[in-house]
């Protein structure tokens, strides 16, 4: 069930937020069932769409999990949304793990997928498996996402052989932004389509638990989804994928630039936060916060004793 965007009708943003379906209410339809990689395949076979949202901290992850989302992705997009980097290339394994641990503590039902950041699997297979193991042992990740197509197939097999599930990621791969010459839609000509199909089939044969597809024409994404056994999760890849993912901050308008074409805003948390902070500041500056009711008080006996002590001190100074 789609959560409605903030209403423009009477009442403030806070009232609009509070009027949404309560957490754990009707739009949570998993009934507390833990999502696994097997669950994703069941959903694909039953043509039941899979939902995935990024989360990078305990509070956000807990809310997303309680809303019934099947996959929580700790994406390397946290480099931009949480750490203020220009792109995803700068974030480190240790920085990623810091956030993966926080999200792990919040989740009860959703499947935790974590991005392996740029440089953590590019040097050699031994280092890649070692880094992947850290994400599982230290971070509690259940699936690791690796960008790249058929050239990553052997590496993915090695990581899977280490008993670590892997999610593939093809199409527009942000870690390859410098090679691609920017964030450009992929697979717009026959050669590009053929390469995407080879990438998808190679990763499917390697045994990926699911396949993220980013920034490609919907027709191509539909072809891939029909050809592979792995569930496909699209972002900017049209409605034919088995599931969809959006960045938490995009969903809630917590970004500071124009959104991508595929982004749909489902709320305006930026406006709510701005209003709340401005209201707090105004109340403090006008001496309306904190009120007497929001303050702690001494017990009557202690207050009386303190007044006696203070009166004695004042008398001594006279």
Predicted regions located by residue number:
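Alpha/beta enzyme core
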Residues: 2-8, 12-267, 271-292, 298-300, ...
């Amino acid at each position: 069930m789609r959560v409605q965007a903030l209403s423009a009708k009477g009442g403030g943003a806070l009232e609009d937020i509070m009027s949404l379906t309560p957490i754990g209410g009707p739009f949570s339809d998993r009934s507390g069932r833990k999502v696994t990689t097997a669950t994703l395949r069941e959903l694909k076979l039953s043509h039941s769409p899979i939902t995935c949202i990024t989360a990078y901290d305990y509070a956000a992850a807990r809310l997303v999990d309680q809303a019934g989302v099947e996959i929580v992705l700790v994406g390397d997009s946290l480099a931009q949304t949480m750490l203020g980097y220009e792109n995803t290339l700068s974030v480190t394994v240790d920085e990623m793990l810091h956030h993966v641990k926080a999200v792990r503590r919040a989740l009860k039902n959703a499947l935790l997928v974590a991005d392996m950041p740029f440089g953590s699997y590019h040097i050699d297979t031994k280092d890649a498996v070692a880094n992947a193991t850290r994400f599982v042992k230290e971070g509690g990740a259940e699936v690791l996402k690796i960008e790249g197509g058929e050239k990553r197939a052997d590496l993915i097999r090695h990581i899977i052989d280490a008993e670590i599930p892997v999610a593939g990621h093809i199409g527009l791969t942000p870690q390859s932004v410098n090679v691609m010459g920017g964030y450009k839609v992929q697979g717009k000509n026959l050669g590009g389509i053929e390469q995407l199909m080879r990438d998808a089939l190679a990763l499917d044969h390697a045994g990926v638990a699911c396949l993220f597809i980013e920034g490609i024409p919907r027709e191509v994404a539909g072809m891939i989804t029909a050809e592979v056994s792995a569930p496909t999760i699209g972002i900017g890849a049209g409605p034919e994928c088995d599931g969809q993912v959006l960045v938490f901050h995009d969903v809630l308008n917590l970004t500071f630039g124009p959104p991508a074409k595929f982004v749909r805003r489902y709320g305006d948390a930026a406006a709510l936060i701005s209003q709340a902070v401005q209201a707090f500041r105004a109340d403090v500056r006008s001496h309306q916060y904190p009120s007497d009711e929001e303050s702690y008080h001494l017990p009557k006996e202690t207050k009386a004793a303190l007044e006696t002590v203070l009166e004695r001190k004042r008398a001594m100074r006279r």
